[in-house]
């Protein structure tokens, strides 16, 4: 009798644990990943191939990807950053996103072409509450800063762009933002 009670209690505890800890279970992602949070599938690789079709070198590929992202994704002013998560499929299906979405999409498209690219998180040097995400990409033997979300907004408004800013190395400090993470 005592043995049956112990088994019943153990099973009950196990079932409760599994019920309430479902989000803690290990889930194998089925995409291709090459960074801390940037994960993508074969559909993103196919899109990257289509964008870069006819490009002869890395520079042309980077600029083609940059142009595609800044012309086809719009800034989502209604996105609730309190519950931010990144999902390339959501960004592509809605054609909207915030800086985090723009940067991770650009990174996935570049990495699909075997182009070294990082996502950079940071905050404004004058306001720690003003968070931002942008990219660093390597082509033609140099690292460059670029900001696809900023440039998408500026293109839509017909204003001058941030563009590509040459860096000494991938982890060079930024003039406007304090870097908190590069991945």
Regions picked out by a protein language model, each given a short descriptive name:
Residues 61-65, 95-110:
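Active-site nucleophilic cysteine motif
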Residues 53, 67, 104-172, 183:
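Hydrophobic/aromatic-rich core segments of domains that either
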Residues 31-93, 138-144, 174-183:
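Secondary-structure boundary elements
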Residues 20-35:
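Sec-dependent signal peptide cleavage junction
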Residues 1-23:
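N-terminal Sec-pathway targeting helices
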Residues 10-12, 86, 130:
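Hydrophobic alpha-helical segments and their boundary regions
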């Amino acid at each position: 009798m005592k043995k049956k009670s112990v088994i019943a209690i153990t099973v009950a505890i196990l079932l409760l644990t599994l019920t309430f800890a479902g989000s803690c279970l290990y889930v194998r992602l089925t995409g291709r990943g090459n960074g801390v949070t940037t994960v993508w599938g074969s559909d993103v690789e196919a899109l990257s191939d289509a964008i870069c079709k006819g490009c002869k070198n890395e520079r042309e590929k980077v600029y083609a990807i940059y142009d595609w992202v800044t012309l086809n994704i719009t800034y989502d002013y209604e996105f609730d950053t309190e519950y931010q998560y990144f999902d390339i499929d959501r960004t592509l299906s809605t054609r909207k996103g915030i800086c985090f979405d723009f940067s991770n999409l650009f990174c996935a498209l570049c990495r699909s072409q075997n182009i070294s690219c990082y996502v950079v998180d940071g905050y404004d040097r004058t306001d720690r509450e003003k968070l931002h995400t942008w990219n660093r990409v390597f082509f033609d033997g140099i690292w460059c800063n670029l900001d696809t979300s900023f440039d998408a907004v500026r293109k839509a408004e017909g204003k001058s762009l941030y563009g590509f800013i040459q860096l000494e190395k991938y982890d060079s400090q930024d003039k406007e933002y304090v870097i908190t993470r590069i991945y």
